[in-house]
Every structure is written in C-alpha cells, then in structure tokens.
C-alpha cells in the first residue's frame, strides 16, 4: 500500500494559465469550455503519471463553476488522484484564480474518471 500512496503523491499535477482576451466572452469572462479543456489535460497528465500508461477520459462528474475568471487572470489548476480502481482512476481537478498578492480563490472543481489503456487502446490494469 505504501507504494501506491507514494505513486499517488507523485502524480500530483499543477498547470498555470493566463486568461488571454481571445479565451473570453463578450463580458471578459473565461469561456467555460476553455477551462474544462485545461482541466481535462491536467487530469490526463495526473492519471498518466500514476498509471505509467496512456489514458482516456471516460466521464466528468460534479463540474462546478463557482466563480468567474477574467481576462488577464492567472489560473492555477491542480490535479490529484482521489481513487484508483482496477483499470480506472478518479482525478480531482481544482482551478483557482491566483491574485497578484499570492492569494487564491477557487473558481472550479470537477472529478474526472480516466481509464488506463494498453497498446491496443483497451482498458488495462
């Protein structure tokens, strides 16, 4: 079990994005789809680090847009394994706006289920 816990801790992934004007709607808020795409990449990297295999996203659960991110905001995305099954993994991804003073405000959270794939793109342990 210690080995699994160690691998889970090592799989933690962080990504930083700056919200560019082209990523926003007419009110200057980040498009939700753009944020979800960033979150999906973080979930995939987290799962790949854990499984040491290619992965694919199966589902996204409990996607919660809590606050808006605006043009020129810095967005910090953090992925962490929360559950490991036989072939699947659950990854929690949280997105924060990071202010210039270093404070962070949660803007989104979702749980991604990903499956590890073998060389024939079939689910594998």
Per-segment meaning from a language model:
Residues 2-59, 115-125:
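Hot-dog-fold acyl-thioester-processing enzymes
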Residues 3-15, 70-71, 82-125:
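HotDog/MaoC-like acyl-thioester-processing domains
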Residues 18-19, 29, 39, 75, ...:
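Hydrophobic aliphatic residue packing
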Residues 42-98:
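A contiguous binding-surface segment within folded domains or other stable secondary-structure elements
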């Amino acid at each position: 079990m210690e080995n699994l816990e160690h691998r889970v801790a090592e799989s933690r992934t962080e990504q930083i994005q700056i919200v560019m004007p082209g990523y926003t709607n007419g009110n200057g808020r980040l498009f939700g789809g753009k944020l979800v795409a960033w979150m999906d990449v973080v979930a995939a990297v987290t799962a790949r680090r854990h499984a040491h295999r290619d992965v694919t996203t199966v589902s996204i659960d409990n996607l919660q847009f809590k606050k808006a991110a605006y043009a020129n905001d810095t967005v910090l995305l953090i992925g962490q394994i929360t559950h490991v099954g036989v072939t699947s993994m659950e990854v929690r991804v949280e997105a924060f706006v990071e202010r210039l003073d270093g404070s962070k405000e949660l803007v989104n959270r979702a749980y991604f289920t990903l499956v590890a794939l073998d060389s024939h793109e079939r689910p594998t342990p």
